[in-house]
Amino acid sequence: AIAAVITFLILFTIFGNALVILAVLTSRSLRAPQNLFLVSLAAADILVATLIIPFSLANELLGYWYFRHMWCEVYLALDVLFCTSSIVHLCAISLDRYWAVSRALEYNSKRTPRRIKCIILTVWLIAAAISLPPLIYKGDQGPQPHGRPQCKLNQEAWYILSSSIGSFFAPCLIMILVYLRIYLIAKRSNRRGPRAKGATREGESKLPHPMAAGASASAKPPTLTSSLAVAGEANGHSKPTGEEGETLEDPVTSTLPPSWPALPNSDQGQKEGVCETSPEEDDEEEECGPQAVPVSPASAGSPPLQQPQGSRVLATLRGQVLLGRGVGAAGGQWWRRRTQLTREKRFTFVLAVVIGVFVLCWFPFFFSYSLGAICPQHCKVPHGLF
């Protein structure tokens, strides 16, 4: 029964991790640089399932090491290498999540495939540094029961403690601290979320607001015109036209934020130009020249204001205000930023669950393994439990 369950787990591990690698390498949506961590982690798990678990199962079922002594040394080194690599990969992924959440703009520009590959190489080098000492220094293998060969990990106390700290306890501590920090950042971001939603968007706060109700009756609401106002024809009213006589849409009013109330068109109630009188001046006759264009006093006599492509011009009684092309785009950037943070937090939560389960599975082994080195005489761990 044990052999059947372990065999099923081996096949399931190989199949599942192969699907992960295939999905990342073939799907365009999964070709982000950080997903290379998942490819390397899946490769380490496949190596554990193919090169470690079958021989470990045979050793447990037979009760002794059936294979050659040389393969025993290589097997133990590979066991430590692949298992340590899996744990350190999870530590690297947690650090990547933390940097992506805490310093998104700065880190995303640095998160290149080359940088991720360098981190993965560092992970494998750390795992190799922990797994190589048993090949160099074998130490005391202990007695051989019934004269049968055994294949056990190094029993030296210094190696047990150092390998346990480097392979499990240090990465586990880093992951706990990192995910605690991510939780605090997410909590603080959620607190600031409602206030950020109600805040005025950057750029729109620079726009002059319509006059409030109750203002002086002689006050005139701002008149919106294009910076390239075209005079009307000598007889009758007309809107600005293009080169072929097609009616052009007012470039200012068409790009105003939706929160602005609709204002009367600049050509309604006006003759031969862009002019308007206040309510007190309705009884008086005021003629506008055919070339009249509203400009500020400071700009009188100066060349007309050039309107860059993609920009907008707001003309009021006090003059013209040139709005850059970035006005109104801050809101979209804010929503994109918030969407990215939400996606990062969701992915971080999933990884936290995976890492939590992984740590719970590894903790009993490393705890009992270290306990035998700390107090070998009084803290005997049963062989079946180990």
UniProtKB/Swiss-Prot annotation:
Ranges of biased composition (kind: Acidic residues): 278-288
UniProt name for this protein: Alpha-2B adrenergic receptor
Membrane found in the keyword field: yes
Region Disordered, annotated ranges: 193-310
Function per UniProt: Alpha-2 adrenergic receptors mediate the catecholamine-induced inhibition of adenylate cyclase through the action of G proteins.
Cytoplasmic side: 26-36, 96-117, 181-350
SUPFAM superfamilies noted in UniProt: Family A G protein-coupled receptor-like
A Gene Ontology BP annotation from the UniProt entry: regulation of vasoconstriction
Disulfide bonds: C72-C151
Biased composition (Low complexity): 289-304
One Pfam family, short name: 7tm_1
Membrane-topology descriptor: Multi-pass membrane protein
Gene Ontology CC: cell surface; plasma membrane
Annotated site residues (Implicated in catechol agonist binding) in this chain: S163, S167
Keyword Disulfide bond carried by entry: yes
An example Gene Ontology molecular-function term: epinephrine binding
Subunit structure comment from the entry: Interacts with RAB26. Interacts with PPP1R9B. Interacts with GGA1, GGA2 and GGA3.
Cell location: Cell membrane
Residues on Extracellular side: 63-72, 141-156, 375-383
Source organism: Amblysomus hottentotus (Hottentot golden mole)
Cleavable signal peptide: none
Family: Belongs to the G-protein coupled receptor 1 family. Adrenergic receptor subfamily. ADRA2B sub-subfamily.
Organism domain of life: Eukaryota
Site (Implicated in ligand binding): D79
This protein's UniProt keywords: Cell membrane, Disulfide bond, G-protein coupled receptor, Lipoprotein, Membrane, Palmitate, Receptor, Transducer, Transmembrane, Transmembrane helix
Bilayer-spanning residue ranges: 1-25, 37-62, 73-95, 118-140, 157-180, 351-374, 384-386
